[in-house]
Amino acid sequence: MKFEFVRFSDLTSTNDEAKKYASEGGPLPALIMAERQSAGRGRLGRSFYSSDNTGLYMTLVFKAPDDDGLFLRLTCLAAVCSVESIRELFGLKAEIKWVNDIFLYGKKRAESLPSHSLLTVKNTLLSALV
């Protein structure tokens, strides 16, 4: 599967940019990435601090299959893949706090936030990973 990678140095939010990208008909699937977010949001729309060049801020955009259980599976899959990658690549003690929070040495460092937006593109899924 071929992905489009769209990288920015600074965005208000990768989620906002992903919605704009999908509504303008950008090729899917696509990964929208930023080195910094000035208005990132977490669960329940809470503000999310995104400092310069110290994190991974991204939103994955793809056509959603008709599957009611997809969001829970994506949430779990993103968390497991993130933790396994952190452990393997960096040798750090990463853990999952059910179901979407990723902890390093007892402190929350990331979360996955699958969400669904119909936008103007029918059946488009926006999924913020980590």
Could you describe each region identified by the protein language model?
Residues 1-89, 110, 124:
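N-terminal lobe of the biotin/lipoate ligase/transferase fold
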Residues 61-65, 115, 130:
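Solvent-exposed residues in well-ordered beta-strands and their adjoining turns
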Residues 79-122, 129:
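Acidic (Asp/Glu) carboxylate-rich active-site/surface patches
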